[in-house]
Amino acid sequence: MESKFKQLSDTEQELEISFSPDEFQPELDKQYKLAQAKAHLKGFRKGKAPLQMIKKMLGRDIQYQVVEELAGKNFESVAKENDLKLVGQAKIRHYELAENEKLSIYLIYEVHPAFELKPFNEYEFKKAEYQVSDETVEKELKKLLQSKGNMVAVEGAAAPTDIVIGDVQKLDADGTAIVGERQENQSFRLEYMKDDSPFFTALNGVNKGEERRVEVEVKEEDVPEENKKQTFLISVKEIKRMELPELTDELVKELSRGKNETVQDFRDELRKQIEAYFTNKSEEDLMESVAQKFLEENVFTAPSSLIKMYEDMLLDNAKRQIGGAFPPGFDETYYRAEIRPNAEKHARWMLIRNKIAELNGIEVSDDDIKALAEKEAKLTGAEATEEFVNTYFSEQYKPYVIDTLLRDKIYEFIKANTKIEVESKLPEAAV
């Protein structure tokens, strides 16, 4: 058996495997005879049809079966001997057969692209250290209390947290009401509007019975220039405000489902949750910056099959977020095209991480897996630690565990070998 490689692109190769007659002909003859023994051909008893007729009628199928078997048996060993870093499965491109002389099988497959990782020890990143204030805790507490509150109509000027209800009339350039462009009883929740929003500016402080004119600039490119500026007249009919209940020990027990007994315990627990959220956010934001920097500095082509794998993952995630399936008529082809750049980034970042691990001897040991299993068992309060360990070492779960641990180790290595500036920051929004 001989093998010959041909580079088709940065990520695609062709392998030609050639066999001598003694390596393929015996198996080919065997399959011809097996087909002859099973054949029911008109004019012949079972198994008595001439071999040449069998070859003429079934030869191509039999040959391809033998080619597939030989390719399957030998490709893995050739790939291992030549240290091929495969992505996905190899495919038979075509084959050339001269019986009793030579068989050549041509396979195409994808490999990890060859690239030199740029030095990164001088990379600089900023990491936010969020300061959770009493004010932040109170804001989140208020959000939780809203589930037990009641909306009540109020007199006086609308506060920045109120809901303004009114009729909206669209006006033309001359200020005249446009027929058919009136919407009644529209709700404007000021709390969720930006401070510089035209609607917030107009309605904050408004009173029941007053009118406010709002000018909005449409930014969509497909809107004609003459329609870029739109004017609305809002007639305020009612102002509603959330009336919150008093936070008591009894309400705390209900909100926490019995986990907390007192108001102070509840506040302390809420602060811990907010701090944990922002600690995690800080880490995720840093890792996003790290990935972006490495992608900018290391430009190469990712294998198409790897990109498709991430496309499929992003597609499945999108489906899960809307109940498991896209609505009828959804253009999946268009959506794939939209998410492909993101999938390509995921693929390239995975290859960069693997390169970092390879160059720096970063590996995951069985002790690492066992330690994680024991840690998770302890966190969940599970008594059967051994069951956790067995699950983490199972054939189904182990690859996922290794990938998670390896990714974490690589991140820690990057953080230890780059410059990270910690900056104090106030939370913009909490959990």
From Swiss-Prot:
Annotated GO biological process: 'de novo' cotranslational protein folding; cell division; chaperone-mediated protein folding; protein transport; protein unfolding
Domain PPIase FKBP-type, residue spans: 161-245
Location(s) in or outside the cell: Cytoplasm
Reactions listed under catalytic activity: [protein]-peptidylproline (omega=180) = [protein]-peptidylproline (omega=0)
Enzyme class (EC, first level): isomerase
Record EC number: 5.2.1.8
GO molecular function ontology, one term from the record: peptidyl-prolyl cis-trans isomerase activity
Role summary: Involved in protein export. Acts as a chaperone by maintaining the newly synthesized protein in an open conformation. Functions as a peptidyl-prolyl cis-trans isomerase.
Listed name of the protein: Trigger factor
Organism the protein comes from: Chloroherpeton thalassium (strain ATCC 35110 / GB-78)
UniProt lineage: Bacteria, Pseudomonadati, Chlorobiota, Chlorobiia, Chlorobiales
